[in-house]
């Protein structure tokens, strides 16, 4: 678990640096990482992007109610919208939640009204604009410390 915790904090850390941090040999560590990848416990090594440098100034979640018979068609239509970055089926007052990244509030408004709002069989939406975000480390991976 310590290995996964450290990799979740920095997937780009070198094997020698990580082996020193964890107190195990680099060859053993390399074998463990390969095994975790093979078992698909580690799906991918990724990076964190500063979205603001790409012109993304507004992030929002949208709750969507839709006709259940048209779930697949609605998902396909949503995936064609560049600003939609994820789609999640949920329980509760919405059927679906999506994440939208936009340049600014005007752009977000345009995406919600002109693109998402025009998809057939979407009954209604509610937009939640992200004001501040704080990510927590994956502490469940760090139980042994």
Label the model's feature ranges.
Residues 1-145:
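A compositional/biophysical signature of low hydrophobicity enriched in polar/charged and small residues
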